Swiss-Prot record:
Superkingdom of source: Bacteria
Organism field: Borrelia hermsii (strain HS1 / DAH)
Gene behind this protein: mutS
The keyword Transit peptide is assigned to this record: no
Name by which UniProt lists this protein: DNA mismatch repair protein MutS
CDD domains: ABC_MutS1 (cd03284)
Protein family: Belongs to the DNA mismatch repair MutS family.
PANTHER family reported for this sequence: DNA MISMATCH REPAIR PROTEIN MSH1, MITOCHONDRIAL, DNA MISMATCH REPAIR PROTEIN MUTS FAMILY MEMBER
Amino acid sequence: MKKDVTPMMRQYLSIKNKHKDAILFFRVGSFYEMFFDDALEGSKLLGLTLTKREDIPMCGVPCHTSKEYIKKLILLDRKVAICEQGGVQTDPKGPLEREVVEVISPGVVVDEDFLQDDVNNYLVAISDYKDYYSFSYIDLSTSRLGIILYEGSFLEKLRRDIEKYSPKEIIVSESFYYKYLEKLALDRFLVNKVPHWHLDKDIAIKSLKDHFNVLSLSAFGFKEDEPYYISSFLIIDYIKNNLKNLLINIDTIYINSDSEYMFLDDVTQINLELVKNNNDLTARYSLYSVLNDCKTPMGKRLLREYILNPLLDIAAINNRLDHVEFLNNNVNLSIKLREILSNVWDIERIISRLQMRKYAKKDFLFIRETLIAFFSVKRLLNEYSFNYWIFDVNDEGDIRGIYSLIDCAISNEQDELIKQGYNSEIDRLRELKNNASKYVDDYLDFERNFSKINSLKIKRINVRGLFFEVTKSYYGQVPSHFIESQTLNSVKRYKTNKLIELERDINDAEDNLLSLEQEIFDEIALKVVKYSTVIKKVAEFCAYIDVVSNFAYLAKKNEYVRPTLTNNKEIILECARHPVVEHYMKGVEAFTRNSVRIDGEKYFCLITGPNMAGKSTYLRQTALVVLMGHIGSFVPANKAIIGITDKIFCRIGASDNISKGESTFLVEMNETANILRNATQDSLIIMDEVGRGTSTNDGLAIACSIVEYILEDIKARSLFATHFHELSAINHDSFVNLSMKIERQGNELIFLREVEEKPSLNSYGIYVARIAGIPLKVIKRANIILKSLTSRENLCVSEFFTSATSVVNDGEDTMEEDLSYELDLNAYLELKNLISKIDINNITPFQAMNLLSEIILKTKM
């Protein structure tokens, strides 16, 4: 640092040194200035003009427009430290006092302009104290702090939860970060690394006890000698350090129980595109986008939570389904509810802002409007005897009290905080401010009548203020209480004690009014905050009614049916549809319905058939329908019986992971290993084209072994799509062959997208390649090679390429003949498969005649 640096710049550098990971907004007058590296980065990110003063790079933004610039930086995953200046200058030669009053970062924002109304904004902390691993999360805008305890193996659960909560920021120890950086891909996030010694059990206990004002952490379900709670301490400590003097509105810690919810690992969440698609990572084309027709921000966030946390308890699921069915059967009730709910505001986030003393008048008006809607919802539900209520008698009284307070106290007028009639002093000051000229005129009339000076006037000059003006002809009539203040050629100017007092009152009225209004406004806010618990109950109630009425609306609109949940090992779906594909195909093409039948005896389905025939859609739709049933939604099918499913594993498609040095095949094997290690007989396994990333023989061997392992060891309900047609020969009592139906019309194939119970012995890959636009020369050569492969299966590679060499003719006749060969090949393979299964030692003459008739029929097709 230069010795001749100014005192203010020394002050800046001292403050910046304490906030190295943030862009420092340094208040200078009416601007926030950035210097040095912050100026270089800020000018680039915010599009600001970069200047220099004494070779110091600098740029700045006006304080009154700073919010927009801060928002841009937050969206770019930057932290912003707000440094304000005080009015005190302790050293006459030094700068004004300055201090950082708040550090705004992506994980701790509460300003509604920085948030998406339908997405929670999570800050996460991961604790690795000794062998006690835990995952705490909070959306500060709703003030809900939760914790997940990991007992035993934790890495797969941690991957699941990082994907589920999609945090804006993560807090971890330095040692944990570098140990698991690649395994958890932590570089995707804004990560705050703390020294490992900061994870101190005793400090955490004291800090949490002090914050929650409790004698023991057992109040939250913790054992103090099992320090899982350290992750919650990390979150609270981080928020307090960032928000400085703001009140922290965290009043409890919720311990999540894994046993209550279906396990969906990170890969499954991604492959099923539950809340975001895999293309641009937005909600469009996700299950959430199809199921979200909620009317409130709270309902939208609750729907996301339901989708990512399907229930396992049949009673809890049926309770939701009962409410959905009731609303589905009472269409008028459902319509009226949704109309009322459209007037509900995000009071869950509003009350959190009130608790942190970051509020505006509109927040109180939104609470009032929401409570009006709440009363209407309650009255409507009572009329229809709808049996959902989470409030007690005291709650209802408190809710009415909150409404009355806001209705009586908060003004609807744009330039007023407090309503007329609530406070007499505010009324007086407002009257004085708004009618100052009338008060002056009234006093002038009084003095005119008293003095009989008809030409008496009251004038105002900025320097002298208000004064009476009397002309020469009336000097003799000037009352004794007039105090002469100035004599001019033709007039004299006077003041009175009353006029001085009136002027002072008028001048002070606006300032006093603003001050008193703010004081009363803050008192009202404190009164409302006392009832934050019951307001959060109202938010919870509105969110739930919103979600179940939304489910009922979608069920009626999309012809969904109520699923039956059982404790049996079964999935029986009649004429099921893929909810997302169907939704986005509307008006373009009718969706082909397919059925699924899996039970305790036949629980493994192998699905074969060509690409483009709909295998992946069939797999995904089965998983999505099962999941929808577990969240209490009606489902897209004519009939649905779903056995409780503890886990869904979905391995569909794969890509390489360059950052980890993992090939596509290795990624596929990692995902498969996770399934085989963690699936149970109550799980649903969805696997597509396992083994395709290596040699044919290796892939076939691996796929076959996986199928056998699932059949014999795991015994989970499974849908396994493959192009290894050899797998269809597996002989097992629980094994079922399914294929995608196709129809041949001349040399063309029609993909019917229907599932039938039989194997497909050909993938029609060359046909698909042709319609994809592969050059005809390549297609014809592929047909020649295919013929050789089919007729000489046992040749070694070198022999094969020698024998398969031939001149490729460009004529169309040859092309059609070659294409026809691939189509005929499937018929031949089906016929061969049928004949090979005939047991001539155990067949009656009648059965033999029927088989011969079937063979003759197939040869004519």
